[in-house]
């Protein structure tokens, strides 16, 4: 469950390390984002010579949340940290690699490129 001012780790090699959510997309009154939702983020920490730099405003897909994800079969999955993958305006990942596991709920939200780059899908 991600809201405005939430800090997230970046799970790709775009050059950003930490980002902060500045808007949840999908309706004017929408307060929270979950796995697979698109948010607008500001890069707070970045590595030198990366594709993005500190202060850049970008879109991102939430790929991991510390809040439980409930599945239709009754099982629950949760992660240790909140993480996102930076995307461009065509909804393609900025980085070429994804780090860490991603849930299969991303498939239902049509983020197939992220699923294919991920080392593990839970």
Swiss-Prot record:
<dbReference type="InterPro" id="IPR005745">
    <property type="entry name" value="Ribosomal_uL14_bac-type"/>
</dbReference>
<keyword id="KW-0687">Ribonucleoprotein</keyword>
<keyword id="KW-0699">rRNA-binding</keyword>
<keyword id="KW-0694">RNA-binding</keyword>
<dbReference type="GO" id="GO:0022625">
    <property type="term" value="C:cytosolic large ribosomal subunit"/>
</dbReference>
<dbReference type="GO" id="GO:0006412">
    <property type="term" value="P:translation"/>
</dbReference>
<dbReference type="InterPro" id="IPR036853">
    <property type="entry name" value="Ribosomal_uL14_sf"/>
</dbReference>
<protein>
    <recommendedName>
        <fullName>Large ribosomal subunit protein uL14</fullName>
    </recommendedName>
</protein>
<keyword id="KW-0689">Ribosomal protein</keyword>
<dbReference type="Pfam" id="PF00238">
    <property type="entry name" value="Ribosomal_L14"/>
</dbReference>
<comment type="similarity">
    <text>Belongs to the universal ribosomal protein uL14 family.</text>
</comment>
<comment type="subunit">
    <text>Part of the 50S ribosomal subunit. Forms a cluster with proteins L3 and L19. In the 70S ribosome, L14 and L19 interact and together make contacts with the 16S rRNA in bridges B5 and B8.</text>
</comment>
<dbReference type="GO" id="GO:0003735">
    <property type="term" value="F:structural constituent of ribosome"/>
</dbReference>
<dbReference type="InterPro" id="IPR019972">
    <property type="entry name" value="Ribosomal_uL14_CS"/>
</dbReference>
<dbReference type="GO" id="GO:0070180">
    <property type="term" value="F:large ribosomal subunit rRNA binding"/>
</dbReference>
<comment type="function">
    <text>Binds to 23S rRNA. Forms part of two intersubunit bridges in the 70S ribosome.</text>
</comment>
<dbReference type="InterPro" id="IPR000218">
    <property type="entry name" value="Ribosomal_uL14"/>
</dbReference>
